[in-house]
Regions:
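Active-site-adjacent structural elements that line small-molecule/cofactor binding pockets in enzymes
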Residues: 1-249
Length: 249
């Protein structure tokens, strides 16, 4: 059965109170989740913490938190804090981001994104499960790392932002869900197939993995203005080489 959430853009023109009002309205109207991306000079965790203070039931997710800009331990700390503030309603959405943004904004070489995602999730899952982590990978080495008393009391679901076959298979192998973006209807079946293959390789039940994605809609009385707002979104993402390739296909 389909379930619905909303994405609130991290818009610096909106005040923290604006976010609280919008999220509360979504909750009252039966939406299951509120997702907030990084952007606009604001981090998503701060915005979600603000929302958590004025909501009670709606799930709160990062959509997404870029992994290149944070260490796995730092990300786990943020997730644990949000789990506490939201009373267990937090969903940790992670993504590798895109090379132009990572390199120009964060000043970090965009190298080995698949390896970085895999190791990041392995470390975070262990930390959030209350384990003492001794980890040696290709990119990270942790010794005696632990969340201690800050370990979440409930499980924090981890979603991966994915479109390509390799990342989709990793969703099936390691994650609780996938968060897709600009996924064409005729590609959706193929994408889910990649997730199922990853799950089967890992001995997991594919049906236990949540399939989620952003669908753009424009709400308004002026059809032309609504279409223009969506055209802006398409143009914005089409300027990114990664999405442009998907649009071309």
């Amino acid at each position: 059965m389909a379930r619905y959430g909303v994405r609130l853009e991290n818009d610096p023109n909106l005040s923290p109170q604006d976010y609280q009002v919008l999220a509360s309205r979504a909750e009252k109207n039966g939406f299951e989740a509120v997702w907030v991306p990084e952007g606009g000079g604001r981090d998503s965790l701060t915005s979600l913490a603000t929302i958590a203070m004025k909501t009670e039931k709606v799930k709160l997710g990062t959509g997404i938190l870029p992994i290149f800009a944070r260490t796995p331990f730092n990300t786990a700390m943020g997730a644990a804090g949000m789990a506490a503030v939201s009373d267990g309603r937090f969903v940790l959405g992670l993504g590798v981001g895109h090379a132009p943004t990572v390199e120009s904004r964060d000043g970090i070489p965009f190298k080995q994104p698949m390896t970085r995602m895999r190791e990041t999730i392995q470390i975070i899952k262990a930390l959030l499960a209350g384990e003492e982590v001794n980890f040696t990978g290709k990119l990270f080495k942790l010794t005696g790392a632990s969340m201690g008393a800050a370990t979440p009391k409930t499980k924090v679901p981890i979603y991966i932002a994915a479109l390509g076959p390799q990342m989709l298979e990793m969703v099936g192998e390691l994650a609780d869900g996938v968060l897709m973006n600009w996924t064409a209807v005729d590609y959706l079946g193929e994408a889910i197939g990649h997730i199922k293959r990853g799950a089967e390789k890992a001995g997991r039940d594919p049906s236990a993995i949540d399939i989620a994605g952003y669908v753009r809609v424009a709400v308004g009385d002026d059809v032309t203005a609504s279409r223009d707002s969506l055209r802006y979104q398409v143009a914005r993402y089409a300027s990114n080489p990664f999405y442009r390739n998907f649009f071309a296909e």
